[in-house]
Structure formats: C-alpha cells, structure tokens
C-alpha cells in the first residue's frame, strides 16, 4: 500500500503522518537558561522494570555469594574467541572495568562512582576512557543472567574486580553489596562544559583557569577521562607536571598521596594497555554504533580488531613481567630502569625501559614467541619523579606487606566510597574494621526513649526559651548536610556540634552554640533522671526540637499535627570525624535558608535545585519546603527576604498567597540586582523583599504551577500535611537503619 493517499474531495495528495514524538526543537533549545527541574524527577518507577515491590537488599541476601565468586574465577581464564583474553586471563580487563566504574566519584558533590551501575548507560558507556569496557560487561552477562535480580550490575562489576585481583594472587580487604542499578542516565551530574571529547585546556569552555586550576566539582582533567591523561597534561609527556594532575584528581575523589601511590602501583601490577595501531581504525562508540552491533562499540578494522590487534587507550604494552600475578614487579621495574620517551604504534606518548634484562622482558599477550620491554605512561613515571610520591613508592618497594595492605585498603575505599554508612553494606565479606572515611557513628547501646518520653521532652524543649526559628534552623542545619549522591551527612551523629560544622557561617555559630547548650542541658537532666540506662542522644534531641517547633507552628495556624519522630540516632565523637572530609559538605548556598556565601556565576535558583536534588527532593517537595521555611522565619541571619507573611512562626501558605498576589509589583534593588522589592501596585508602598530563590516560584512556569496549588484558598491543610511529610523525610534521610 502506498503511504500517499488522495483526498476524495480535492484530489490532493496527503502524506501519512509519521510519529515524531520526542523530536523537534525543545524548550531547552528555545530557552537555554531555563531552570533544569528535570534533575528532580529522575529514576522514577516508569523507567524501572523491577516493579514497586522489588527490594534489592532482600534479594541480595538470598544470593550465594561464594557461588558467584566461583563462577567469576572460572570465567577469568575462559578466553572467548570474540574477545580473547590477554595471556589467557581477563583479570586486567575486569580490574579496569571496576576501577572506571568507581573512579568517576568526586567528593566535591558526592556524585559519580560505582553505586548505580551507570557505566552501562550513556554517557559513561561511550567515554573515550572506557574504550572496550563494553566487552568486559558482555563477558559478565552469562553470570548476571544466571543470578538475575539477586545481584545488580553495579555490585557485579565491583565484585568482578575483586575476584580478578583474588584470582591473580592478591588478598582483598573485603566486599560489600548493596548498590542498586540505575535504569536511565543520570542527568544531575556535571561532567564539564566542553563540547568535544578529550578537549585540551586551550579549547573553548575549558575546565581550567589560572595556573591550571581545575573547575569544581570536576575530578578529571579532560572530558571523557576518569582521572588524568596518561600521556601527561594535555598530552605533554612531563612526569613532574603529570604528578600535579594526579595529585589533584585523586585528592578530589578523596584519596591522599599514600592511597594514590598504592592504587596506581597496585592497579598497574596487572594487565596491559592497548594501542596496536592508529585510532583511525576504530569505529564509533556504543551510543553511535549501528544497531546491528547491539550495543557494542569501537569496532576496529586494524588486523583482527582484537587480541594482539586491540586498540583502546592508544598506549601499548604492559608494565611488568607476569601481568597476571600479584608481585612487586611494577615498583621494581619503575625504579630499576631508565626510561626513553617513544610513540606507541597508535601515536601516543609513552616510555620504554632501557637496556632491559632478559628476566624483565614481557611475553606477548597473544603470541608467546614475542617479547617486549616494560612500558610506563607519563602518569606512572610521576610516582618516580614527583618529590612527594617518590619516597612513598620507594617505601612500598622496600616493604611489600605494607604495600599490599595499602593497596587492599585503597581499592576497598575506591570501590565503596559512594555507598555511605556501613549500615548499607550487605554480604558475608563486609570487613569488621570500622574506617574513618565511612563516617562512623556509635552503635545504640542503651534503651531508647518511648512515646511518653518524647511527649515530655517536647514540652521541655518548647518551654526552654528557644524560639521556633532557632529550633527549626538547628534541626535543618543538622539534617540537611545529607547528600543522596554518596549517602554522606545527615543528623545522625550530631556532628553539627563538632568541627567543622559548628563553625560554618551558614549555621550561625553564635546562635547554634546557644541552642546546643540549651538542648544539652535538657539531655543531661533527662539522662541523669533515668534508671536502667535509658538515654536520649543529642542527635535525637536536635531533631525532636525541630519536630516540636513545626508542630507548634502548625498549631499556631489551627492545625493539630504530629510530626513523625523515631529515636535511634547516636552522637559521634571527634575521633570518628575527619574534619577535612566533612569540610566538603559545607553549603556554598542554601536556598532553603536564603543563604549564599558569595556571588557565583551560577544563578541562586540553580544552586537551590542542585541542593534539592542532593536532598532527593522532587519539585513539589522543594516548593512546599521553601514556602514553609520562609513563614517559619528561618532565614540565615534573620533577614526578612521571602518572609511573605504578617504572622511569622505560623505554618501557613502565606508565602504562596502573597507571592502570587497581582497587587504586588517587583523590581530589583539598586544595591543588589539579586534582591527584589515588592511594592503595592496601586500605592507604591513597600510590602516585601525577596531573593531570586523566592521569586523563582512565581517566575518559572513549572514552579508557579506548583505554587498555585499551595496558594489556593482550600490548600491550608494540604500545605501543612505536605510540609510535615517532607520535613520528616529530610530528618530521616540518613536513617538507613529504618529501611
């Protein structure tokens, strides 16, 4: 049948409509600066095939982990014709896969990492640094297929890396499961602004400024790389300059110098790099590959395109003899030889050892009749020529047991850093040792307060002289450090009373000190009066104070509500708190408290949405939370901006009613273009002041639509109930023990 048809009246030809859903010019094309609220609505049930009742933690507990590991050990040496194993062992490939899955983590915002299995989705599945890792995941498919829902891709990729190390003679520190797979690309992660892969720092929209200052929160030197350019900064083969890049990038994913040396030297003990021929032979990445390739990319026309003809990074060769065995070979070779700079067959800068002894020659990965000199990348040589790395590397060389322990611990940290507290760890191989980077909190070792105690403590808190804004602000400050990205922060531990949080400007240290002293007095009086060991922690009391204040504010508005509260938080010690590690949680802006530390190139409302996403909020939750915080009078420094009510400390929908009032006109102030005055349209009399954060709920069409829901005459009760629900959510974001 022809796709053309004629109208029986006019005789004109009309083409059949072709579905073009999702195509065409988008809102983002028309208005590039439009606020990106889509990051608040990711990973919904509509993209998840597992169903609403699926509980991954429960499924993982049914897994025979030992059996999975045996299957992984077996596949390591089961070389497949379609992608032959180097030296008959896939260990090096799977270590690289696990490393690159975890290595996207950056501690600046906690995003990236191995926690969601995103290496199998765009853009990571097609990054230049992940060339041919698609093959590693296909090698794992029979095992994933066998165990199905009991193990996620995210867990399997990390476990495969562990098993690769173990199968080659290394004793790992442990393994924890619990990573749940994502089913759609993560839209909230900022990977950089460059518009070409591997763009160097002299290209437009560079991530570098000044004296090679890397843009925050990025932790990789070029678009599409995990860490550094192995050839050197911007491809310049300078080992000392490369050391600076290595230090900066590894530090940004929470590794110190000793951990960095251990990771590089330990990881490069295994496997090889692949650069058998020019990159012009390599086809498109998975996302751009033809449909018949079925999700595989980088098809190569060089020779067989695999085995000894493989092209991945462009660098060619192995670092040491016996690349499928754990030993001290990497560090021995690194310091034993002098190195000459050469170009690989693919044209990449690398270094070959000079005057190599026969015992250090490396047998070909796919042709045992051939032997090759050891290779080092420019980044590898930074371990020898960087003045800080060099003595660490030599110490490891002279102390093999220390080196093995350092690598085991660093590898565990690399692959588990974004999982959050130990309470999320699953499986029989979870290490018993508590590590400071896990942000530990004491176990509950006492009887918890009951409903009667909770009611009594609320009365005492509200009678203490502390105001609603003080109690709400303190509870918010304690709980809102949580990041859904790496599951750090939150109210558990009461670290708001410790450095660095007690001194953060956003937390108003003087006010905070007053509130904490008062709450500590209530805590001590309660605990001292108990027989039998019942106690209340300060962490619980801080949250309870906020809940009591919200209840009182709702009561002031005529609503009798009970804010949910579950005790069980404990108080961390200074010894359990890494000050430097917690410093990255300090907010540069908190729109919920109308706070901004300085002026930034990023608009205030964008910072609000970013923070809301880290708090796992939806757009409606963000909206009702801001509206409630304003009428509760919780602004930083007590500023009146956005407090659109004549009855503060009363939980009403006044913020929305007055923001949406057409009787008010808004203009930026002469002193600050980001502060606005709202004047009576008829008289010109000043009514309100507000920030960009406040006004965006009337300006942005999507947020205004939500604000209108809460601004209606019949929405008072809904507003209070919704605010209480999201408040409770924030207070419990880190309570993984309640799941």
Curated annotation (Swiss-Prot):
Annotated GO CC locations: cytosol
PROSITE patterns according to UniProt: PEROXIDASE_1, PEROXIDASE_2, PEROXIDASE_4
Gene3D superfamilies recorded: 1.10.520.10, Peroxidase, domain 2
CDD domains, per database record: catalase_peroxidase_1, catalase_peroxidase_2
GO biological process assignments: cellular response to hydrogen peroxide; hydrogen peroxide catabolic process
Active site, per annotation: 100
Catalytic activity: H2O2 + AH2 = A + 2 H2O; 2 H2O2 = O2 + 2 H2O
Domain of life of the source: Bacteria
Cofactor: heme b
Enzyme Commission number(s) of this protein: 1.11.1.21
Enzyme class at the top of the EC tree: oxidoreductase
GO terms for MF: catalase activity; heme binding; metal ion binding
Assembly: Homodimer or homotetramer.
Family (UniProt): Belongs to the peroxidase family. Peroxidase/catalase subfamily.
PANTHER family in the cross-refs: CATALASE-PEROXIDASE, HYDROPEROXIDASE I, BIFUNCTIONAL CATALASE-PEROXIDASE
Protein name per Swiss-Prot or TrEMBL: Catalase-peroxidase
Organism of origin: Syntrophotalea carbinolica (strain DSM 2380 / NBRC 103641 / GraBd1)
